[in-house]
């Protein structure tokens, strides 16, 4: 049976919009920093709390991996924020669809985002020795979306929906 439309729910809508806004803000900060090396973003609180330094690092593009695997000029070697915008839009759209494949894609994309969040958090703390407020907030949003996606599969007493 095909997928049908439904409301994504207020929590998913709020999380996706917050993630999208933060991803767009990260793109803005990265672009402003590229134009002006002295640019100071609102999220740049100090030397060890600097989102613009994180966004401008080699790990702020293609997760620090794409350039080494596919080359610097690969179309996939984009700012991580671009992937964030795509992810949060996809989460919102898939959250509006009712159907088995939409549910599977929703949960699978959440798990991928969770793995990416753990990887980037490790880079943030143990390689860059930084604290990025925007980054940490997006990781929390990704955890929230993952929890929400798996909760939607179960009914009120923990029973799987539709069974």
Curated annotation (Swiss-Prot):
Detail which positions bind phylloquinone: 135, 139
| Activity regulation text | Inhibited by warfarin (coumadin). Warfarin locks VKORC1 in both redox states into the closed conformation.
Q: Tell me where it resides.
A: Endoplasmic reticulum membrane
| GO BP, sorted A to Z | blood coagulation; bone development; peptidyl-glutamic acid carboxylation; vitamin K metabolic process
List all topological domains (Cytoplasmic). 1-9, 96-100, 154-163
Annotated transmembrane regions:
10-29, 81-95, 101-128, 132-153
Q: What is this protein called?
A: Vitamin K epoxide reductase complex subunit 1
The organism encoding this protein is Bos taurus (Bovine)
